[in-house]
Amino acid sequence: MKSKIWVIFIILFISVMSVNQANEFNHKTKRVPAEWEPQEATWMQWPGYWEKDNEIAFAKIADIISRYQKLHILFHSDQIYVDAHKALNDIGVDPQGKNIRWHAVPYDNSWMRDNGPVYVLNDDEIRIQNWNFNAWGGAFGPDIPFNLDNSVPDKVGTILDIPVDHIDIVHERGNLEFNGSDTVILNWSTIGDPNRNLNYNKKQAEHDLKEYFGVKQVIFIEGIPDGDLTKGHIDGIARFIGPRTVVVLQCTSRSLCRPDSKDAEIYNKAAKIIEKAGFNVIREPIEGFVNHKDLMFDTNYMNWLVGNGFVIVPGFGNPKTDIMAKSRIENYFPDRDVYLIEMLSSWSAGGGVHCHTNDQPAFSVSN
């Protein structure tokens, strides 16, 4: 009798272990690639009439990206298509070049990082996640439309023939930093914003993020830098540059945010949280500030875009700080060509090159 009980016990033990191992396997195979991994393409939503000031920078960004990899450009009217072609022709870029694809897709704004797809590899299958988007919790006022933006991931999924999963949580990809294996860093002040997700809590958010992204570790920083209408997107504060290394912004005596300011406290606390989680931290100093159309803001170069062999960095038209930043970022990415593009109009509206672009990992199938 005892021997039978032991046999049953062993069978049950093996069954439980097998289930746990299967769950662990599934957990490990679901992941979001890091931005420095090989990419299939980059996507952009060309600016419309009310974002016309961004068009020159868009053309320059498109020029650089299309030299290295495919670029998909969305346009939502015949006039935008014409304007985009003219902007590219004006700087000597063939709008119908071999790496450029055009798609007539309706959308509301040119910030595709935030309303665009999140690509997830799950058991060797690529899937798109479409998180809810409500124009940054209504931060820019009730008149800013966003319903068309919300449908963009579905349109991209149709173009690429990739299945789309709808996530009933309001969030933006600009607040997600992945190391490509086991960790995501994000700002709780964004996803926990009651104008995005009412009555949402950290425990539930951590569970959801692990479930949807396959990560084992969720690192929350907190705090909203002065003037940040996104309520603290992580891609302006802390960026992975390797599986175990994170660059974190730092106020200096030369920046508007002083070393003893609230913003400095946000960045310093973020660095400590990330370091405590087991990562190497490099501080990215803010070396100055600029004045653009009576708006003053710090020269924050964190909003860079990484692609196949290149990095594009938002420039501020300040030769001294631009040159210093380019040198630092070349050290972060020694195997890539680094470009700076002056993007003061975009920055005054709340973002840079990373905010305007959406990278598609190389494991997906592109038309």
Question: Could you say what each language-model-derived stretch is?
Answer:
Residues N23-N367:
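The feature marks the mature, well-folded catalytic cores of soluble enzymes
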Residues I8-V16:
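Bacterial N-terminal signal peptides
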